[in-house]
A protein has these predicted regions:
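RNA-contacting regions in translation and RNA-metabolism proteins
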Residues: 1-164
């Protein structure tokens, strides 16, 4: 039994190293990677935060004219990468995690650790993603179950809540 070393381009550690190499603010510790989730070859979602509130942590990762992130996307053969600013407010973090879709509202059920994200009808498929990939990765990133609903399906109910 010779020991074997497995090296994989599919693990999240690979993406982390690419960002460490490409982004000086990550190397220096000014920008911190909170969590990375991915479906290798398709999409990565990465939550970042900054130790300095005046520093744009997402902008640092993207780089001038998208240069830094484009180098990483190129290295990953065109895999999509969503860099999301981490947030301690869970409904805000879930809304951000559904990027590139924009949630209008996120309802939280603490007991079940379940969230319902309301999105504009024309953004429903973007929020869910191809074969559910976007919402699945958002759920892994936030550690919450996420249900995505179109605004038209809940507009009556949501309206009642706001008015009542």
């Amino acid at each position: 039994g010779n020991p074997q070393v497995m090296v994989s381009r599919a693990c999240t550690g690979f993406v982390k190293r690419l960002f460490e190499m490409e982004v000086p603010e990550i190397r220096s510790g000014l920008v911190v990677i909170k969590k990375i989730v991915r479906e290798a070859g398709y999409r990565t979602k990465m939550a970042v935060t900054s130790v300095d509130p005046s520093l744009d942590c997402v902008g640092s990762c993207v780089g001038p004219r998208g240069m830094r992130i484009n180098n990483i996307v190129h290295e990953l053969d065109g895999e999509k990468i969503d860099v999301i600013e981490w947030c301690s407010d869970i409904s805000e973090f879930i809304a951000r995690a559904l990027s590139p879709a924009k949630a209008m509202m996120v309802q939280i059920n603490e007991e079940e650790k379940k969230a319902t994200a309301i999105v504009p009808d024309d953004k429903l498929s973007l929020a869910i993603g191809k074969a559910g990939q976007n919402v699945r990765l958002a759920a892994k990133l936030t550690d919450w179950k996420i249900d995505v609903k179109p605004y038209s399906e809940v507009s009556g109910i949501v309206g009642d809540v706001f008015e009542g």
